[in-house]
Structure formats: C-alpha cells, structure tokens
Amino acid sequence: MAYVNFGEDNQLPFNIIKMIGIDEVMSQNKLFNVITCYGAGLKYMDVDTRQPTTHPEIKRWLIHNSLPLFQLEQATDMKYFFFCVSVIILSRDGKRINRLIHKEACYCRFQQARRGKINHVIYANFRENASLRPEDYEVIRLLDPRDPLGDLMVLMGREPGRDGETRARTDDRKFAILVRFPTPGFQYYPIPYYTSIFRGDWYDIKRLIGKGKKAKLR
C-alpha cells in the first residue's frame, strides 16, 4: 500500500525530536506545553450531579484504558507534530468501544488520498528507513477526520450515508481517528509553526555560541 513520506527522506519526525532534544530551552518548553495541555486531566462527569461519575461500568472502562496516559500521549504528539492519531477497537458485535489506544505520530504514515480522502493510516517502525516486511505494517482504516462518529455509524450500518443508503455493517473492528491542527496549505503532515526556528539562523547561532564558550574553557 502506497503511503506519503513524512518529509523528503521520511525521517522528518525523528529529526524534529532530535533537534528539540538538544536544545535545553525548547525541550523544557515542550514539556511545559504538554503539561499545560493536560491540565487537571480528563474527567467523565455525571450530567445530573455535575461530579465525576460513579457508574461502575464507566469507571472500569476509564481505568482499563488509562485515560491519563492517553491524554499525555496525545498532547505530546500534538505539541510536537501538530497531529495525533488514536485507535478505537470495537466489541465483536460492534456495539461498544472496548479499547482506546494512542499511536505514536512519528511512526504513522498516511495512505495517498483517493478522491480527496485518506482511507488508511499505516503504522510501522520507519526510523532510519529500516527494511520492513509486509507483515511489519499495520494498516488501519481511517475514519473521516471531520466527522469520525458519523463515519463510524455509517460503516456499522446504523445510519445512512450521504447518498441516503444504509450499508451492510463492515467486518472491521479497528479504526483510526486523526486530529490535525490546521496549517496553511493543508498538507498531509502539518508543518508546525514553531519549526520556523530551525529554518532561521538563530537556532544554529545559539548552538555555536555555546560551543565557542566551551572551547575557550578547555
């Protein structure tokens, strides 16, 4: 299955991680942004009491899916790459969401769009362009980013599509959900605004100043 490279050599996300990691200010700024985005964490509130739910089934689902970790993972990818991917796994009868899983954005690639729509997310270890076998790729059906719930309802045969027809329920039970922060040009992979730092001169100058001072101390 053909996918779109993430950067010219398909290594852009790993290069971004490296460039942020070697800058002590930027890396701490990213941590601050993620923690701020996390805030007080996710809470499922009861509509009537306006307090965190005490419903045993809901509480069990929240615990088994580790929502605090999920939120931190999603926030981290959003702050680094301006997009994040999650996967929902339905029950066998297709009536419930059993699992909610985060997928690392740096290992996600998008299938080439057909008629303006991306139909699948490809998940694999693309680091250093490692040699991958067909079984190393996880191909996940992507729900419509603008209306994932509506798309899921149509695929499960619970609502008619835009053509007014109700389809037979799909056999798929695993679906990807994509959230992208809007950037000019609407590329496959957003170009975060902060990456202008790397395209300017001061990122390199700042590092050279540190190296120069270090050399004088020797």
For each predicted feature, which ranges?
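Structured, contiguous alpha/beta core segments that scaffold functional sites
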Residues: 1-22, 34-37, 41-218
